[in-house]
Amino acid sequence: MSSHSQFALLKQRRFLPFFATQAFGAFNDNVYRQAIIGLLFFLGVSTEERTLYTNLAPALFILPYFLFSATAGQIAEKLEKSRLIRITTSMEIAIMSLAAIGFLTQNMVLLLVALFCTGLQSTLFGPVKYSILPSVLKREELTGGNG
C-alpha cells in the first residue's frame, strides 16, 4: 500500500469537477437559507412571522428528503450518473433563478417554493454523489474521495 496525500485527488480531472459541484451546491444551499432569514430581518416582519418562516424554512428544505429519497435512489440507478449530475446542476441553476426573482420581488412564498425545490434537487443529487465515487476512484482513493 503506497502512502500518498489524499489531497492529490483535487488535482485529478476525474475528481475535481465532481468535488467542485458538490462543494458549491452545499455552499449555495446554506447561503440561500441564510439569505431568506436575512430578508425577514430586512423586511422588518413581526416577531411571530419571523419565527414562523425561520422554522418553516428548514422544514421545507428537509421535506423532499423524506418524500423522495427512495425515488431518487431508483432514478440514480436507472440514469447514467454523469448525465444525472448535469441534470441536477441545471435544476439548481433554474431554481436559483426563480429564487432571484423571489428576492427581487421580496415574495416569501416564491422563496419558500424555491427552497423546497432546492431540497428536492439535493435529494436527487444525493444518491449520485455517493454512488459515482467507486466508478471514478481507485479503491485506495475512496477514503479521501468520501472525506
Name what the model sees in each region:
Residues 13, 45-52, 83, 106:
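Juxtamembrane loop-transmembrane helix junctions in multi-pass integral membrane proteins
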Residues 7-8, 102, 124, 134:
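Short secondary-structure boundary/capping segments
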Residues 16-34, 57-95, 110-147:
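Substrate-agnostic recognition of the 12-TM MFS/MFS-like secondary transporter fold
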Residues 35-65:
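Extracellular/periplasmic helix-loop-helix junction of adjacent transmembrane segments
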Residues 98-103, 118:
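MFS-fold secondary transporters
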Residues 44-46, 69, 102-107, 122:
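Short helix-capping/hinge motifs at transmembrane helix termini and TM-loop junctions
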Residues 1-11:
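Short, Lys/Arg-rich, polar N-terminal cytosolic tail immediately upstream
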Residues 12, 48, 78, 104-105, ...:
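Helix-loop interface residues and adjacent transmembrane-helix termini in multi-pass membrane transporters
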